[in-house]
Amino acid sequence: MSLLDYFKTKKEPNTAVTAKERLQIIVAHQRGEREAPDYFPQMKQEIIEVIRKYVQVGPDQVSVQLEQTDDNFSVLELNVTLPEQN
């Protein structure tokens, strides 16, 4: 890396690439909801309520997904965007 490379402005990602990534996330989320068991929405809500007891997060900061694999087992994926600590 040369010294000039350090001072160059960094290019922001292309908006088309960003839109494509967001669309892929939405499609994957909707696909997961179709295959989820009947109890999944209630379980998801209860998990979010437990997290809110300890951390102030909005509903858009918590992602709960259930993935079915070919090996006859399920994977529950939970992503929480935690607020910055001051």
From Swiss-Prot:
It comes from the Bacteria. It holds the Pfam family MinE. InterPro entries: MinE, MinE_sf. GO terms for biological process: cell division; regulation of division septum assembly. Keywords: Cell cycle, Cell division. NCBIfam families: minE, PRK00296.1. Prevents the cell division inhibition by proteins MinC and MinD at internal division sites while permitting inhibition at polar sites. This ensures cell division at the proper site by restricting the formation of a division septum at the midpoint of the long axis of the cell. Belongs to the MinE family. This is Cell division topological specificity factor. The gene is minE.
